[in-house]
From Swiss-Prot:
It comes from Homo sapiens. Keywords: DNA-binding, Metal-binding, Zinc, Zinc-finger. Coiled coil: none annotated. GO terms for molecular function: DNA binding; zinc ion binding. The lineage of its organism: Eukaryota, Metazoa, Chordata, Craniata, Vertebrata. It comes from the Eukaryota. A zinc finger (THAP-type) spans 1-85. Pfam families: THAP. Residues 83-121 are annotated as: Disordered. The keyword Iron does not apply. This is THAP domain-containing protein 8.
Length: 274
């Protein structure tokens, strides 16, 4: 927390320079020395005020005899009592009040030949009566009356302001429209490539399906030809198990008749039909 002076009408803080062009130093109140503390408070004009251990007085309120120097450092003597206090308001507040008050400049003196400021033309419907008052040598006031015809209003230029934003909007939309068109063309090309790839895959699938059917037909023909070339002597026996778990029927292609293997208790009831 920065140090500051607690004396009335004093606003010195740490880092400022004093009257001797040296940094202002701060000293705590002698809270443990009652008589000396009362002397400090009497010189400050705050006899009924009780300072705390965190409040200080700056070196500007002590005379040079209240200090002692050791190795270039300024120390406060044990019996030093502050005696320099300002009873008026601080100069800073005076400067602040002066700066807040705006100087009132006197009005410039009127000149005889000073032209009147021109006011904006106000359209009127009829003649205007103008009264001019001015000091003269003969009488205190001279009244001059004249009739003025109203001026025709100046032609206002055609409003072309709304066209400018429209042109700016068109010029701003041109690049955006071109970018969107390029993007659409790019997407169309990608779609065409995907369609070509899909058609190629469909043709390949049809070709593979046809080849698989042709190979299956060839295998069937080969089996048929091999079966025709083999004689009855070279026929093989095929075993087919059908029915329930108690019936097993064996079929053979050789001249031997088919045999039926079954359990003894089921021979008379379960006979497979030819």
């Amino acid at each position: 927390m920065p140090k500051y002076c607690r004396a009335p009408n004093c606003s010195n803080t740490a880092g400022r320079l004093g009257a001797d062009n040296r940094p202002v130093s701060f000293y705590k109140f002698p809270l443990k020395d009652g008589p000396r503390l009362q002397a400090w408070l009497q010189h400050m004009g705050c006899e009924h005020w009780v300072p705390s251990c965190h409040q200080h007085l700056c070196s500007e309120h002590f005379t040079p005899s209240c200090f002692q120097w050791r190795w270039g450092v300024r120390y406060l003597r044990p019996d030093a009592v502050p005696s320099i206090f300002s009873r008026g308001p601080p100069a800073k507040s005076q400067r602040r009040t002066r700066s807040t008050q705006k100087p009132v400049s006197p009005p410039p003196p009127l000149q005889k030949n000073t032209p009147l400021p021109q006011s904006p033309a106000i359209p009127v419907s009829g003649p205007v009566r103008l009264v001019v008052l001015g000091p003269t040598s003969g009488s205190p006031k001279t009244v001059a009356t004249m009739l003025l015809t109203p001026l025709a209003p100046a032609p206002t230029p055609e409003r072309s302001q709304p066209e400018v934003p429209a042109q700016q909007a068109q010029t701003g939309l041109g690049p955006v429209l071109g970018a969107l068109q390029r993007r659409v063309r790019r997407l169309q090309r990608c779609q065409e490539r995907h369609q070509a790839q899909l058609q190629a895959l469909e043709r390949l699938a049809q070709q593979l399906h046809g080849e698989s059917l042709l190979a299956r037909a060839r295998r069937g023909l080969q089996r048929l030809t091999t079966a025709q070339t083999l004689g009855p002597e070279e026929s093989q026996t095929f075993t087919i198990i059908c029915g329930g778990p108690d019936i097993a029927m064996v079929l053979a292609q050789d001249p031997a008749p088919a045999t039926v293997d079954a359990k003894p208790e089921l021979l008379d009831t379960r006979i497979p039909s030819a």
